[in-house]
């Protein structure tokens, strides 16, 4: 029961567009859940982009995605190393927003 109440206060984690509210722990957990949702969309879009790509595009796409993951992780680590509890929120929002942006970018590849 308590976990359900906490999740409800932390925003509707089922809606990736809804904001995360609550205390720091609840907001961090909400951001993790939203990042996981966007990561799932990203992985689906990536697999579809690989499938739709002509053979000559596949290796560059794989390389770009590997480098993008490294960049995202390093970039968000920078925010996570800040001072205070806000750094955890900054890092979580960094992961969520960068993952969302990349997912939407890859989803758009099929429309070009």
Where would I find each of the regions flagged by the language model?
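N-terminal alpha-helical modules
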Residues: 8-112
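Classic N-terminal secretory signal peptides
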Residues: 1-9
């Amino acid at each position: 029961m308590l976990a359900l109440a906490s999740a409800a206060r932390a925003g509707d984690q089922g809606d990736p567009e809804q904001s995360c509210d609550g205390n720091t722990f609840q907001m961090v957990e909400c951001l993790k859940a939203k990042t996981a949702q966007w990561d799932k969309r990203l992985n689906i879009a990536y697999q579809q982009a690989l499938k739709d790509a002509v053979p000559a595009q596949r290796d560059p796409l794989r390389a770009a995605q590997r480098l993008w993951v490294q960049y995202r992780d390093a970039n968000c680590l920078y925010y996570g190393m800040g001072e205070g509890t806000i750094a955890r929120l900054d890092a979580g929002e960094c992961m969520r927003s960068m993952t969302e942006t990349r997912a939407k970018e890859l989803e758009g590849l099929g429309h070009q």
